[in-house]
Curated annotation (Swiss-Prot):
One of its GO terms (molecular function) is translation release factor activity, codon specific. Gene3D superfamilies: 3.30.160.20, 3.30.70.1660, Release factor. It is found in: Cytoplasm. This is Peptide chain release factor 2. The gene for this protein contains a UGA in-frame termination codon after Leu-24; a naturally occurring frameshift enables complete translation of RF-2. This provides a mechanism for the protein to regulate its own production. Peptide chain release factor 2 directs the termination of translation in response to the peptide chain termination codons UGA and UAA. GO terms for biological process: viral translational frameshifting. Keywords: Cytoplasm, Methylation, Protein biosynthesis. It holds the Pfam family RF-1. GO terms for cellular component: cytoplasm. It comes from Staphylococcus aureus (strain bovine RF122 / ET3-1).
Amino acid sequence: MELSEIKRNIDKYNQDLTQIRGSLDLENKETNIQEYEEMMAEPNFWDNQTKAQDIIDKNNALKAIVNGYKTLQAEVDDMDATWDLLQEEFDEEMKEDLEQEVINFKAKVDEYELQLLLDGPHDANNAILELHPGAGGTESQDWANMLFRMYQRYCEKKGFKVETVDYLPGDEAGIKSVTLLIKGHNAYGYLKAEKGVHRLVRISPFDSSGRRHTSFASCDVIPDFNNDEIEIEINPDDITVDTFRASGAGGQHINKTESAIRITHHPSGIVVNNQNERSQIKNREAAMKMLKSKLYQLKLEEQAREMAEIRGEQKEIGWGSQIRSYVFHPYSMVKDHRTNEETGKVDAVMDGDIGPFIESYLRQTMSHD
């Protein structure tokens, strides 16, 4: 890359950041941060823990936007200063370092812009992610377990905390179901892109004849709603509460006491399990919170369908639709059928490198909004 081209890129980044700044209202955000931090310094701040945590989360979200912008602007200023130095006295090594910085900077701006776009009403929430194998016994149960690991690795790389809330192992291998609580800013905003059916094509390790098999597993993702977000009343007569022994990765008291909880909500048919906590009381509280989140999400989806009918829109059916194929044989390819994003790096994807698929889907849906 010639010096003149490097300079054009730096100038373009400066223009991009100026445009971004114009939409941010940084001064107002910094005022809000100051107000939140004054609240956090009050001696009675933790009297209402739910409200306190909400203020902390909002403050952290604002600081991420403000500090993210300032960091990007400082990097552009540094690149500009380095270019000026090269004009005064050329140095090949310095020029190569600057060229690499210019190349890498685009990805940083793209990531920052994507975070700004995650401004849906629940995008900032934690996420509840469930995996269920399709028909096919051990083969599909093993596929669900592979997806379980993929999402764990993705969340680890994103800095999200993963709690296994419920885990039901397969008969021979894999899992029959798993429920994860994924904690982190914008966890739902990112992971909502994964809702749908995932298809695997491979030579089965469970088939002695070495035949090719196709397996399916479904992924469901809903926001983990805060109690003050949910206006849902549950009639005690509408639910059945059962206890059972914890059965796997999530249970800390495995096969010792019946601390795990299953709640069945009869009007909706929704069933939730929780075995993550040591005590039955805490598992019941967590399960009720999850049930409320699911019922609230159901209510929101019904409202969205009603609005779509009023507007006369044809909505895409998300649940039950195949969103992505993972082909291990006869060639290596992972392809998202919604965006046509694809890669031949199957091993990297299964190790959690699904960011490009999520980002391309989010950008596509945002451009259609």
